[in-house]
Structures are given as structure tokens and as C-alpha cells.
């Protein structure tokens, strides 16, 4: 019998004073590929709190991306419930989930998905045009250190700069939560540190709950809490009493 890790330890930065942002209870996800049954998640319980910087750590195939997609309303669990504040995402229809993603969640993926024919400013403005209370696109680009590159097209930007535009696009709608799936996976170490510093700044200055998926244990050193997955299960949850700044990381 497996005992689930305790999540009741005191938070070293006092970030658990408010209600949980996400509460996942007994999340199981099963995929069927022909006659093959793949269980990506197995009875996962996890609570995320406002203002945390959480790293989901584990090897490829451990269930990290599946969990992130379920939290973000991009996928649904086969069993279990997911709540965002007092909203039961598990019982929400497609329209409600679209509204949830639009109003509350910013996504950053390994690949930037910028529109090549639009400038950095115009790529960010795609989000600000539909958000409830958006930043100005220029303000979002300044937040990620790209104010002077606002009128450049993606082809004129480095990989790290393109990822920062993607982060600007994600934060321009002022999301409550920033969900990042291997945001440094396509970048070298030095460029990855720059990108992580941007996510760190968003978490610190805007109070945005940040969740970062990675297989890189070094990146976990900057988290306030580390959730380690293996084989579709959470095998460890640990507090980090002294998170390292992104600028101090190297791999």
C-alpha cells in the first residue's frame, strides 16, 4: 500500500494564507490506443496555493504534462475531481472550460507557437484583444525585457526571445495561474536561465501562481515546492525553504 505524501507542512514564505487555487482529488487518466490501455495518472491528489512557485519534476512519461493539461482545462480526468477555487472543472462543459482558460490561465509551452507574419507586439495583442482586464501589449513585453524588440517579427528574434514573447502573451491577460510545460526544453542553459528569470519575476511581482514542468532537477532548486512524479503517481512533495534565484542556476 502506497502512502500519499503529506501536503500540510507550513509554507516557508507564508504563501498558503488564502484558499487553494487548484485542488485535485483522486485524479486518474487512462488512454486507449487500439487494444493498448495506458494509465498516465494513478490517483493523484494535489493542492496548489496562490502565489506558489511549484515545479513538477520527473522523467518523460511520468504524467507531468497530463496533470498540467488537466489542471489547465485542456484535458479531463478519467476519474477524480479538479476544483479551481470553488469551481468544479470536472463538471464543466467545453464552453465553461474555454472561458476558464481565457480568464484565469496562461500557458507557456516548449515551442513558442508565434504567428510568423505578426510582430512581437501583434502576437501579444492577440490575447489582449479578448481578455477581460489585459495589460497593454507593450507593458507585457517590457515585463519580459523585450520592449525594444516589440516591432520585430519572430524570424528576427532568437529562440530565447521568442519564448519570452510567448510568456508576454501568456501574462498579458493577467492570469491567476501560469502553467509552463518544459519552457526551457528547446534552449541552451544560459538562455534557459533568462527565461526562468522572467517566470520568476512574474511570480514575484504579479503574485501569479507558477507551475513549471521539467525533467531537470537543477530547475527544481528555484521552486518553493517540488512535486516529483514517477509512473503516473506523486512519489514526493517537498518544501524548499531556501529557493535559489534563477540567475544562480546552471546546467
Where are these regions (language model features)?
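ABC family nucleotide-binding domain
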Residues: 20-229, 234
Amino acid at each position: 500500500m502506497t502512502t500519499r505524501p503529506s501536503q500540510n507542512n507550513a509554507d516557508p514564505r507564508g504563501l498558503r494564507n488564502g484558499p487553494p487555487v487548484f485542488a485535485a482529488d483522486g485524479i486518474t487518466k487512462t488512454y486507449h490506443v487500439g487494444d493498448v490501455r495506458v494509465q498516465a495518472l494513478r490517483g493523484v491528489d494535489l493542492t496548489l496555493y496562490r502565489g506558489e512557485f511549484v515545479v513538477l519534476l520527473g522523467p518523460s512519461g511520468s504524467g507531468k504534462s497530463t496533470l498540467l493539461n488537466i489542471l489547465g482545462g485542456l484535458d479531463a480526468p478519467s476519474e477524480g475531481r479538479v476544483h479551481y477555487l470553488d469551481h468544479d472543472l470536472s463538471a464543466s462543459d467545453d464552453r465553461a472550460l474555454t472561458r476558464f482558460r481565457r480568464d484565469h490561465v496562461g500557458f507557456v509551452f516548449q515551442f513558442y507557437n508565434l504567428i510568423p507574419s505578426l510582430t512581437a507586439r501583434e502576437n501579444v495583442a492577440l490575447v489582449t484583444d479578448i481578455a477581460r482586464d489585459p495589460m497593454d501589449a507593450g507593458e507585457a513585453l517590457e515585463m519580459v525585457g523585450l520592449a525594444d524588440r516589440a516591432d520585430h517579427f519572430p524570424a528576427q528574434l532568437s529562440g530565447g526571445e521568442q519564448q519570452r514573447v510567448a510568456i508576454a502573451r501568456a501574462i498579458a491577460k493577467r492570469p491567476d495561474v501560469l502553467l509552463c510545460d518544459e519552457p526551457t526544453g528547446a534552449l541552451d542553459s544560459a538562455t534557459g536561465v533568462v527565461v526562468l528569470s522572467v517566470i520568476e519575476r512574474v511570480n514575484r511581482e504579479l503574485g501569479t501562481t507558477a507551475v513549471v514542468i521539467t525533467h531537470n532537477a537543477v530547475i527544481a532548486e528555484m521552486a518553493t515546492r517540488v512535486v516529483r512524479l514517477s509512473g503516473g503517481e506523486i512519489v514526493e512533495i517537498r518544501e524548499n525553504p531556501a529557493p535559489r534565484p534563477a540567475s544562480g542556476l546552471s546546467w
